[in-house]
Amino acid sequence: MAFHYPDHGLAMDPSSAAASSPNPSFSPGGGGGGGVGGGEREKAAVAAHPLYERLLEAHVACLRVATPVDQLPRIDAQIAARPPPLAAASAAAAAGGPSGGEELDLFMTHYVLLLCSFKEQLQQHVRVHAMEAVMGCWELEQSLQSLTGASPGEGTGATMSDDEDNQVDSEANMFDGNDGSDGMGFGPLMLTEGERSLVERVRHELKNELKQGYKEKLVDIREEILRKRRAGKLPGDTASILKAWWQAHSKWPYPTEDDKARLVQETGLQLKQINNWFINQRKRNWHSNPASSGEKTKKKRNVTGDGGAEQSW
Protein backbone atom coordinates (compact mmCIF):
# COMPACT_ATOMS: atom_id res chain seq x y z
CA MET A 1 0.00 0.00 0.00
CA ALA A 2 1.32 3.43 -0.88
CA PHE A 3 0.02 6.99 -0.60
CA HIS A 4 1.15 9.60 -3.08
CA TYR A 5 1.07 13.40 -2.87
CA PRO A 6 -0.87 14.81 -5.82
CA ASP A 7 0.10 18.09 -7.42
CA HIS A 8 -3.47 19.37 -7.65
CA GLY A 9 -5.38 20.93 -4.76
CA LEU A 10 -7.38 19.03 -2.16
CA ALA A 11 -11.13 19.19 -2.71
CA MET A 12 -13.47 20.83 -0.25
CA ASP A 13 -15.73 17.81 0.53
CA PRO A 14 -14.59 14.60 2.24
CA SER A 15 -15.28 12.25 -0.65
CA SER A 16 -13.44 14.22 -3.31
CA ALA A 17 -10.67 15.02 -0.82
CA ALA A 18 -10.13 11.37 -0.15
CA ALA A 19 -10.29 10.51 -3.83
CA SER A 20 -7.58 13.01 -4.72
CA SER A 21 -5.27 12.27 -1.80
CA PRO A 22 -4.44 8.57 -1.28
CA ASN A 23 -3.45 5.99 -3.85
CA PRO A 24 -6.36 3.73 -4.91
CA SER A 25 -4.30 0.70 -3.92
CA PHE A 26 -5.25 1.32 -0.26
CA SER A 27 -7.65 -1.23 1.21
CA PRO A 28 -8.36 -2.76 4.64
CA GLY A 29 -5.56 -4.94 5.80
CA GLY A 30 -3.16 -3.57 3.19
CA GLY A 31 -4.44 -5.75 0.34
CA GLY A 32 -5.25 -4.54 -3.15
CA GLY A 33 -8.64 -2.83 -3.28
CA GLY A 34 -8.83 -1.62 -6.85
CA GLY A 35 -12.07 -0.67 -8.52
CA VAL A 36 -15.03 1.29 -7.27
CA GLY A 37 -15.34 -0.59 -4.00
CA GLY A 38 -11.72 0.01 -3.01
CA GLY A 39 -11.98 3.71 -3.85
CA GLU A 40 -15.10 4.14 -1.72
CA ARG A 41 -13.49 2.43 1.26
CA GLU A 42 -10.46 4.64 0.83
CA LYS A 43 -12.60 7.78 0.79
CA ALA A 44 -14.37 6.65 3.93
CA ALA A 45 -11.05 6.01 5.68
CA VAL A 46 -9.73 9.50 4.94
CA ALA A 47 -13.02 11.22 5.82
CA ALA A 48 -13.23 9.40 9.16
CA HIS A 49 -9.59 10.00 10.11
CA PRO A 50 -9.01 12.27 13.17
CA LEU A 51 -6.60 14.47 11.18
CA TYR A 52 -8.99 15.09 8.30
CA GLU A 53 -10.35 18.34 9.74
CA ARG A 54 -6.82 19.58 10.39
CA LEU A 55 -5.82 18.66 6.84
CA LEU A 56 -8.81 20.52 5.44
CA GLU A 57 -7.97 23.61 7.53
CA ALA A 58 -4.39 23.57 6.25
CA HIS A 59 -5.60 23.29 2.68
CA VAL A 60 -8.05 26.18 3.07
CA ALA A 61 -5.30 28.27 4.68
CA CYS A 62 -3.19 27.77 1.56
CA LEU A 63 -6.10 28.86 -0.63
CA ARG A 64 -6.63 32.03 1.40
CA VAL A 65 -3.06 33.27 1.02
CA ALA A 66 -3.25 34.41 -2.59
CA THR A 67 -7.02 34.53 -3.06
CA PRO A 68 -8.31 38.05 -3.81
CA VAL A 69 -10.21 39.63 -0.96
CA ASP A 70 -13.46 39.75 -2.91
CA GLN A 71 -13.24 35.98 -3.58
CA LEU A 72 -12.76 34.90 0.05
CA PRO A 73 -16.53 34.70 0.74
CA ARG A 74 -16.77 31.93 -1.85
CA ILE A 75 -14.36 29.80 0.17
CA ASP A 76 -16.32 30.51 3.36
CA ALA A 77 -19.55 29.55 1.60
CA GLN A 78 -18.10 26.23 0.45
CA ILE A 79 -16.88 25.44 3.96
CA ALA A 80 -20.27 26.33 5.44
CA ALA A 81 -22.04 24.09 2.91
CA ARG A 82 -20.08 20.96 3.81
CA PRO A 83 -21.58 18.50 6.34
CA PRO A 84 -20.51 18.72 9.99
CA PRO A 85 -17.54 16.56 11.07
CA LEU A 86 -19.75 14.21 13.08
CA ALA A 87 -22.10 13.71 10.15
CA ALA A 88 -19.19 13.01 7.82
CA ALA A 89 -17.72 10.47 10.24
CA SER A 90 -21.09 8.77 10.65
CA ALA A 91 -21.51 8.56 6.89
CA ALA A 92 -18.03 7.09 6.56
CA ALA A 93 -18.76 4.50 9.23
CA ALA A 94 -22.04 3.59 7.54
CA ALA A 95 -20.15 3.04 4.30
CA GLY A 96 -17.93 0.54 6.05
CA GLY A 97 -14.87 2.77 6.04
CA PRO A 98 -11.74 1.21 7.54
CA SER A 99 -9.45 2.91 10.01
CA GLY A 100 -6.58 2.86 7.51
CA GLY A 101 -3.96 1.70 9.93
CA GLU A 102 -0.52 3.11 10.53
CA GLU A 103 0.14 3.92 6.89
CA LEU A 104 -2.91 6.19 6.67
CA ASP A 105 -1.90 7.91 9.93
CA LEU A 106 1.56 8.57 8.52
CA PHE A 107 0.14 9.85 5.26
CA MET A 108 -2.29 12.24 6.95
CA THR A 109 0.43 13.57 9.24
CA HIS A 110 2.85 14.16 6.39
CA TYR A 111 0.17 15.79 4.25
CA VAL A 112 -0.75 18.26 7.01
CA LEU A 113 2.90 19.18 7.53
CA LEU A 114 3.37 19.55 3.79
CA LEU A 115 0.42 21.94 3.51
CA CYS A 116 1.60 24.02 6.48
CA SER A 117 5.03 24.36 4.90
CA PHE A 118 3.46 25.22 1.56
CA LYS A 119 1.39 27.95 3.20
CA GLU A 120 4.53 29.59 4.61
CA GLN A 121 6.19 29.47 1.20
CA LEU A 122 3.12 31.01 -0.42
CA GLN A 123 3.03 33.83 2.14
CA GLN A 124 6.69 34.60 1.55
CA HIS A 125 6.19 34.51 -2.20
CA VAL A 126 3.19 36.83 -2.09
CA ARG A 127 4.88 39.36 0.19
CA VAL A 128 8.17 39.51 -1.67
CA HIS A 129 6.86 39.53 -5.21
CA ALA A 130 3.87 41.73 -4.44
CA MET A 131 6.16 44.32 -2.88
CA GLU A 132 8.39 44.12 -5.95
CA ALA A 133 5.31 44.78 -8.08
CA VAL A 134 4.26 47.70 -5.90
CA MET A 135 7.73 49.23 -6.03
CA GLY A 136 7.82 48.73 -9.79
CA CYS A 137 4.52 50.60 -10.15
CA TRP A 138 5.86 53.35 -7.93
CA GLU A 139 8.98 53.72 -10.07
CA LEU A 140 6.82 53.90 -13.19
CA GLU A 141 4.70 56.61 -11.58
CA GLN A 142 7.81 58.58 -10.66
CA SER A 143 9.14 58.29 -14.21
CA LEU A 144 5.79 59.39 -15.61
CA GLN A 145 5.72 62.33 -13.22
CA SER A 146 9.22 63.41 -14.29
CA LEU A 147 8.12 63.28 -17.94
CA THR A 148 4.76 65.03 -17.59
CA GLY A 149 5.18 67.09 -14.41
CA ALA A 150 1.81 65.82 -13.18
CA SER A 151 1.45 63.99 -9.90
CA PRO A 152 -0.34 60.62 -10.24
CA GLY A 153 -2.61 61.40 -7.28
CA GLU A 154 -3.17 65.05 -8.15
CA GLY A 155 -6.79 66.11 -7.85
CA THR A 156 -7.99 62.94 -6.15
CA GLY A 157 -7.62 64.19 -2.58
CA ALA A 158 -6.08 60.87 -1.60
CA THR A 159 -4.25 60.83 1.71
CA MET A 160 -2.46 58.24 3.77
CA SER A 161 -4.45 57.55 6.90
CA ASP A 162 -5.34 54.65 9.15
CA ASP A 163 -9.04 54.94 8.34
CA GLU A 164 -8.62 54.85 4.55
CA ASP A 165 -9.70 51.53 3.09
CA ASN A 166 -10.07 52.43 -0.57
CA GLN A 167 -6.78 54.09 -1.52
CA VAL A 168 -6.17 51.69 -4.39
CA ASP A 169 -9.60 52.47 -5.82
CA SER A 170 -8.98 56.21 -5.49
CA GLU A 171 -5.74 55.82 -7.40
CA ALA A 172 -7.61 53.93 -10.12
CA ASN A 173 -10.05 56.84 -10.39
CA MET A 174 -7.34 58.81 -12.18
CA PHE A 175 -8.25 56.89 -15.30
CA ASP A 176 -12.02 57.42 -15.08
CA GLY A 177 -13.44 58.40 -18.45
CA ASN A 178 -10.67 56.61 -20.34
CA ASP A 179 -10.60 53.19 -21.94
CA GLY A 180 -7.79 52.06 -19.64
CA SER A 181 -5.01 53.83 -21.54
CA ASP A 182 -2.90 56.64 -20.17
CA GLY A 183 -3.79 58.95 -23.06
CA MET A 184 -0.17 59.39 -24.13
CA GLY A 185 0.41 56.19 -26.07
CA PHE A 186 2.12 54.27 -23.26
CA GLY A 187 -0.53 51.54 -23.21
CA PRO A 188 -2.95 50.46 -20.44
CA LEU A 189 -1.92 51.28 -16.88
CA MET A 190 -4.99 50.14 -14.93
CA LEU A 191 -4.67 47.16 -12.62
CA THR A 192 -7.08 44.28 -12.89
CA GLU A 193 -9.52 43.58 -10.07
CA GLY A 194 -7.38 40.72 -8.81
CA GLU A 195 -4.22 42.83 -8.89
CA ARG A 196 -5.89 45.67 -7.01
CA SER A 197 -7.13 43.23 -4.39
CA LEU A 198 -3.65 41.76 -4.04
CA VAL A 199 -2.00 45.17 -3.68
CA GLU A 200 -4.60 46.23 -1.13
CA ARG A 201 -4.14 43.04 0.83
CA VAL A 202 -0.34 43.34 0.91
CA ARG A 203 -0.57 47.00 1.93
CA HIS A 204 -2.99 46.13 4.74
CA GLU A 205 -0.78 43.30 6.03
CA LEU A 206 2.36 45.42 5.94
CA LYS A 207 0.62 48.25 7.77
CA ASN A 208 -0.57 45.85 10.47
CA GLU A 209 2.94 44.40 10.85
CA LEU A 210 4.41 47.89 11.23
CA LYS A 211 1.77 48.80 13.79
CA GLN A 212 2.43 45.67 15.81
CA GLY A 213 6.19 46.18 15.61
CA TYR A 214 6.10 49.77 16.84
CA LYS A 215 2.94 49.71 18.94
CA GLU A 216 4.66 49.18 22.29
CA LYS A 217 7.28 51.82 21.55
CA LEU A 218 4.64 54.35 20.55
CA VAL A 219 2.64 53.64 23.70
CA ASP A 220 5.75 54.06 25.86
CA ILE A 221 6.61 57.37 24.17
CA ARG A 222 3.06 58.64 24.62
CA GLU A 223 3.03 57.68 28.30
CA GLU A 224 6.38 59.40 28.82
CA ILE A 225 5.12 62.60 27.21
CA LEU A 226 1.95 62.58 29.32
CA ARG A 227 3.95 61.86 32.47
CA LYS A 228 6.24 64.81 31.82
CA ARG A 229 3.27 67.05 31.13
CA ARG A 230 1.62 66.01 34.38
CA ALA A 231 4.86 66.45 36.30
CA GLY A 232 5.49 69.92 34.88
CA LYS A 233 1.97 71.25 35.36
CA LEU A 234 1.09 72.88 38.68
CA PRO A 235 -2.33 72.01 40.10
CA GLY A 236 -5.16 74.51 40.36
CA ASP A 237 -4.36 78.23 40.56
CA THR A 238 -0.99 77.74 42.23
CA ALA A 239 0.80 79.13 39.18
CA SER A 240 -1.22 82.34 39.48
CA ILE A 241 -0.18 82.76 43.13
CA LEU A 242 3.49 82.28 42.29
CA LYS A 243 3.29 84.62 39.30
CA ALA A 244 1.60 87.28 41.46
CA TRP A 245 4.45 87.09 43.95
CA TRP A 246 6.91 87.29 41.04
CA GLN A 247 5.28 90.41 39.64
CA ALA A 248 5.27 92.07 43.06
CA HIS A 249 8.99 91.34 43.56
CA SER A 250 10.21 91.60 39.96
CA LYS A 251 13.16 93.76 40.94
CA TRP A 252 14.44 91.11 43.33
CA PRO A 253 12.68 87.78 42.67
CA TYR A 254 14.41 85.81 45.42
CA PRO A 255 11.94 84.80 48.14
CA THR A 256 13.21 84.46 51.69
CA GLU A 257 12.59 81.38 53.77
CA ASP A 258 9.58 83.09 55.35
CA ASP A 259 8.25 83.97 51.89
CA LYS A 260 8.67 80.37 50.80
CA ALA A 261 6.87 79.11 53.90
CA ARG A 262 3.90 81.40 53.19
CA LEU A 263 3.84 80.29 49.54
CA VAL A 264 3.86 76.65 50.65
CA GLN A 265 0.78 77.30 52.79
CA GLU A 266 -1.00 79.27 50.08
CA THR A 267 -0.32 76.88 47.20
CA GLY A 268 -0.13 73.53 48.95
CA LEU A 269 3.08 72.75 47.06
CA GLN A 270 6.24 71.31 48.51
CA LEU A 271 9.23 73.50 49.24
CA LYS A 272 11.21 71.76 46.49
CA GLN A 273 8.50 72.59 43.95
CA ILE A 274 8.54 76.24 45.03
CA ASN A 275 12.32 76.42 44.64
CA ASN A 276 12.24 74.75 41.23
CA TRP A 277 9.52 77.07 39.96
CA PHE A 278 11.47 80.20 40.91
CA ILE A 279 14.70 78.80 39.44
CA ASN A 280 12.97 78.05 36.13
CA GLN A 281 11.12 81.38 36.16
CA ARG A 282 14.38 83.30 36.64
CA LYS A 283 15.94 81.35 33.78
CA ARG A 284 13.02 82.18 31.51
CA ASN A 285 13.23 85.88 32.36
CA TRP A 286 16.99 86.22 32.56
CA HIS A 287 17.33 87.95 29.16
CA SER A 288 14.06 89.88 29.35
CA ASN A 289 15.62 92.79 31.27
CA PRO A 290 19.37 92.89 30.47
CA ALA A 291 19.77 96.43 31.82
CA SER A 292 19.01 95.36 35.37
CA SER A 293 20.78 91.99 35.19
CA GLY A 294 24.08 93.46 36.36
CA GLU A 295 22.44 95.20 39.30
CA LYS A 296 20.63 92.01 40.29
CA THR A 297 23.81 89.96 40.15
CA LYS A 298 25.71 92.51 42.26
CA LYS A 299 22.94 92.71 44.85
CA LYS A 300 22.69 88.93 44.95
CA ARG A 301 26.40 88.57 45.63
CA ASN A 302 26.17 91.06 48.50
CA VAL A 303 23.27 89.18 50.06
CA THR A 304 24.83 85.71 49.64
CA GLY A 305 28.26 86.74 50.83
CA ASP A 306 27.81 84.97 54.17
CA GLY A 307 27.32 81.63 52.38
CA GLY A 308 23.84 81.02 53.75
CA ALA A 309 21.72 82.16 50.83
CA GLU A 310 19.98 80.32 47.98
CA GLN A 311 22.09 78.35 45.56
CA SER A 312 22.98 80.20 42.37
CA TRP A 313 21.19 79.11 39.24
Curated annotation (Swiss-Prot):
It comes from the Eukaryota. The keyword Cell cycle does not apply. It is found in: Nucleus. SMART domains: ELK, HOX, KNOX1, KNOX2. Signal peptide: none annotated. One of its GO terms (biological process) is regulation of DNA-templated transcription. Isoform 1 is expressed in roots, leaf blades, leaf sheaths and flowers. Isoform 2 is expressed in leaf blades, leaf sheaths and flowers. Gene3D superfamilies: Homeodomain-like (1.10.10.60). Residues 226-289 bind DNA. Keywords: DNA-binding, Homeobox, Nucleus. InterPro entries: ELK_dom (IPR005539), HD (IPR001356), Homeodomain-like_sf (IPR009057), KN_HD (IPR008422), KNOX1 (IPR005540), KNOX2 (IPR005541), TALE_homeobox (IPR050224). The keyword Transmembrane does not apply. GO terms for molecular function: DNA binding. Disulfide bonds: none annotated. GO terms for cellular component: nucleus. Residues 13-40, 282-313 are annotated as: Disordered. Residues 28-38 have a biased composition (Gly residues). Residues 205-225 form the ELK domain. Belongs to the TALE/KNOX homeobox family. This is Homeobox protein knotted-1-like 2. It comes from Oryza sativa subsp. japonica (Rice).
